[in-house]
């Protein structure tokens, strides 16, 4: 069964809304791990709208599971990753005007640049995951740039408005997962997953880890982080 990476970006979103010092993402990560998180994920955006550089530096020293740093494939972010050395990096697309990450990274259209970044990071013993749509061409390109992981973008599945569409999107994810594993990639998934839709994705053969943030932080506002994480672990198990 898939493990759970808890994205704590929106703890920082609340903090940055008032430009204050609380709530503290580092404390949130500790509580998430106490609740059973198998990993902690943060996205250091170029505009620093939520997670800050200092957060990542502190998390590198305090996270006891593993730290997944989401970032754009820019020289600045590569330098930060090489300095901090997270347990692994997930390369994601990024637009300043977006509310959250929209769609997967286009590996096919920028294969030389992505290949260069993957090489730099993995030569420094930092495994790289690529956040992509489950398109056969994107999976093939991910193999070509020698990434260790892909993270399948589950947004269309999560946003499906009827059962027929949802099942079509799930089948698309399943096919992508199977193709990637056969090609030697390890497979994670995330984006838009909730307590109510997570199990079918978690149950896909070979799925390793689900990176989930917004729904857990929303639930945590009502019941606390530890309980919210425990409940997501139960949902992943289909309980």
From Swiss-Prot:
Gene Ontology cellular-component annotations: cytosol
Please name every pair of cysteines joined by a disulfide bond in this record. Answer: none
Q: At what residues does the UniProt record annotate the site feature described as Transition state stabilizer?
A: 151
Locate the active site. 43, 70, 191
Residues binding 1-deoxy-D-xylulose 5-phosphate: 9-10, 45, 50, 100
The record's GO molecular-function terms, alphabetically, read: pyridoxine 5'-phosphate synthase activity
Protein name per its UniProtKB record? Pyridoxine 5'-phosphate synthase
Query: To which species is this protein native?
Result: Nostoc sp. (strain PCC 7120 / SAG 25.82 / UTEX 2576)
Q: What is the lineage of its organism?
A: Bacteria, Bacillati, Cyanobacteriota, Cyanophyceae, Nostocales
């Amino acid at each position: 069964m898939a493990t759970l990476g808890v994205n704590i970006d929106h703890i920082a979103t609340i903090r940055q809304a008032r430009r204050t010092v609380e709530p503290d993402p580092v404390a949130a990560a500790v509580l998430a791990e106490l609740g059973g998180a198998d990993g902690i994920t943060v996205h250091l955006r170029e505009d620093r709208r939520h997670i800050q550089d200092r957060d990542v530096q502190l998390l590198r020293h305090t996270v006891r599971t593993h730290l997944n740093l989401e970032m754009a494939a820019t020289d600045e972010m590569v330098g930060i990753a090489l300095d901090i050395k997270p347990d692994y990096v997930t390369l994601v697309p990024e637009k300043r005007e977006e509310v959250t990450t929209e769609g997967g990274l286009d590996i096919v259209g920028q294969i030389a640049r992505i290949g260069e970044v993957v090489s730099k990071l993995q030569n420094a013993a930092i495994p790289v995951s690529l956040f992509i749509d489950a398109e056969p061409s994107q999976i093939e390109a991910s193999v070509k740039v020698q990434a260790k992981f892909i993270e399948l973008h589950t947004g269309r599945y999560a946003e499906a408005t009827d059962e027929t569409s949802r099942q079509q999107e799930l089948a698309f994810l399943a096919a992508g997962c199977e193709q990637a594993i056969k090609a030697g990639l390890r497979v994670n998934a995330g984006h838009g997953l909730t307590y109510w839709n997570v199990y079918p994705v978690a149950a896909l053969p070979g799925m390793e880890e689900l990176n989930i943030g917004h729904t857990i932080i929303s639930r945590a506002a009502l019941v606390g982080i530890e309980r919210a994480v425990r409940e997501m672990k139960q949902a992943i198990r289909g309980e």
